[in-house]
Design a protein with these regions (language model features):
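Pore domain of cation channels
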Residues: 423-483
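Generic, well-ordered alpha-helical scaffold segments in large soluble proteins
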Residues: 366, 413, 417, 464-467, ...
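Generic alpha-helical structural element
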Residues: 336, 349-352, 399, 403, ...
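Hydrophobic, well-ordered secondary-structure elements that form the walls
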Residues: 360, 414, 477
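Alpha-helix capping/termination and helix-coil
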Residues: 355, 371, 409, 418-421, ...
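Core alpha-helical transmembrane segments of integral membrane proteins
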Residues: 380-449
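N-terminal leader/targeting and pre-domain segments
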Residues: 2-381
Length: 483
């Protein structure tokens, strides 16, 4: 994609970006009406050429007066870049970001660039506003466009506002935000807002935050984009990805009060070494969800029916985890449990505390199956497989009832068919089934009894199986009923 600029006559000083409704001449008060205070008075039509060769006008903006811009920036005056097209960033200085980190803060009256277009068409360029203290207003980039640019906003203090990128567009750019302090405003608490942005082939990073802020990606639409959020050493107040679309979102080393990710379309969402403090709701079309090595002291509500991967490896839960549809979460959870069965044990204890006993049994069953797969002693492994088969490791009592009936029928048929086994008073198959039943349950009416030693030994074996099997069945059944 290429950007072309053509100077035009514009006596009415009407400017717009993306569509003609986003203009300084609108009457609804939604878009900024004030134009730049560092403009040159020269207007330009901005065209975009796509890969197919189609050329479309995307904006009509003013070109800046770079000498005036340098003067204002150096003196810390208020800079308004509304409806400005910028493709030269020398006015920011030639220092690299790491070279200005040790410099003292520069006090600035204000800085905004709403409905602006910042395009780098040459060597890699940095748009870095660093080591600055803004006295009034938001640092606002709403509706602006960033093309082929490295945007660095670090060591900033926005004393009476927030950092805002609402409705901005990013293309082949890197955004790095760190050490930001926002004072908020009467309408919003301190936050960094990327609401309704559009991004293609972009990387967004936050790191080394100096204040507990909220991050808002409401309805953000991105492709080929990676979002990495790390607030260390501070916390995030709230993280919002409601109705957002993203490829990869990774949140690390964060203490988070509230997480709101509803109706989102995210290929891979990962929380690593995070601590959840109050409430977290995660739902939508999320292909991979990783919550690893985290501490949950909050209430989670998870609704990820289409997740192909779901891991809770190394996570400690002291809060509550609620699944809207746990059945759909079983396949990805059990696939991940082969490497860390303890996550199923953690969920089992969670469901026991919340009274979701069916889900508790499911977790117990798959946890025990994972342990069986890891068992190296063949004899123990065979015993565990048998326990799974007859009762699902204690979670399926009616399977045990079928086993009891099958054993009675098996011994009755053996008594009937084996010539060396005989009972007094039994001649037909049903009578031998009856003999097997009273032996199994140790009833002992006295109407039937074994006639030889071999029959007595076999009956003794069946009686032992009957006592143990019946006791086991009653324990499993009472556990189900009492709960």
């Amino acid at each position: 994609m290429q950007i072309f600029v053509e100077k035009i006559e514009n006596p009415s000083q009407e400017f717009w970006i993306w569509k003609k409704e986003i203009t300084n001449r609108q009457t609804g008060g939604i878009y900024p009406s004030a134009i730049s205070n560092v403009g040159s008075g020269i207007s330009a039509a901005i065209y975009q050429k796509d890969e197919a060769g189609h050329v479309t006008q995307i904006a009509q903006l003013q070109l800046p007066d770079y000498e005036k811009l340098v003067e204002y920036y150096s003196a810390g005056k208020e800079i308004n870049l509304n409806y400005i097209y910028i493709d030269d960033f020398a006015w920011l200085g030639d220092e690299l970001p790491y070279e200005v980190e040790s410099l003292p803060y520069t006090e600035r009256e204000g800085f905004s660039a709403r409905c602006a277009l910042l395009n780098n068409h040459g060597e890699p360029a940095y748009f870095h506003i660093m080591q600055s203290k803004l006295k009034k207003g938001d640092m606002d980039f709403s509706y602006s466009g960033f093309f082929n640019l490295n945007l660095d906003l670090c060591n900033l203090s926005v004393e009476q506002g927030n950092l805002v990128f609402d409705f901005a567009r990013f293309d082949h750019s890197n955004i790095s935000v760190g050490m930001i302090a926002c004072g908020g405003n009467p309408y919003f608490s301190p936050e960094i807002s990327f609401s309704y942005i559009k991004a293609d082939t972009v990387k967004i990073d936050t790191m080394l935050m100096s204040q507990s802020l909220s991050l808002d990606f409401l309805c953000a639409k991105t492709s080929n984009t990676t979002i990495s959020l790390d607030p260390l050493p501070t916390t995030f107040k709230e993280i919002c990805f409601v109705k957002a679309a993203a490829n990869t979102v990774t949140i690390t080393n964060a203490e988070i009060d509230t997480v709101d990710i509803r109706e989102a379309h995210i290929d891979s969402l990962a929380f690593k070494r995070c601590k959840f403090l109050e409430y977290a709701e995660i739902g939508g079309h999320i292909q991979e969800l990783h919550i690893d090595d985290c501490i949950n002291a909050a209430v989670w509500k998870l609704s990820v029916p289409q997740a192909q991967t779901l891991t809770l490896s190394g996570t400690i839960n002291t809060g509550r985890i609620c699944f809207t549809d746990f059945v759909s979460a079983i396949p990805p959870l059990t696939a991940a449990s082969s490497s860390d069965p303890a996550q199923l044990l953690m969920l089992k204890e969670n469901f026991r505390q919340t009274g979701e006993y069916e889900n508790e049994d499911i977790c117990h069953l798959y946890f025990q199956r994972s342990k069986t797969k890891c068992e190296r002693n063949r004899l123990k492994k065979a015993g565990r497989y048998m326990l799974d088969g007859i009762s699902g490791y204690g979670t399926k009592p009616f399977r045990m009832l079928l086993v009891i009936l099958a054993v009675i029928v098996l011994f009755g048929t053996l008594y009937y068919c084996a010539p060396f086994l005989s009972f007094h008073g039994a001649s037909t198959w049903l009578e031998h089934i009856y003999a097997s039943g009273i032996t199994f349950f140790a009833v002992g009416y006295g109407d039937l009894f074994p006639l030889n030693t071999i029959t007595k030994m076999v009956s003794l074996t069946e009686a032992f199986l009957g006592v143990t099997s019946t006791s086991y069945f009653l324990v499993l059944l009472s556990r189900k009923v009492i709960r």
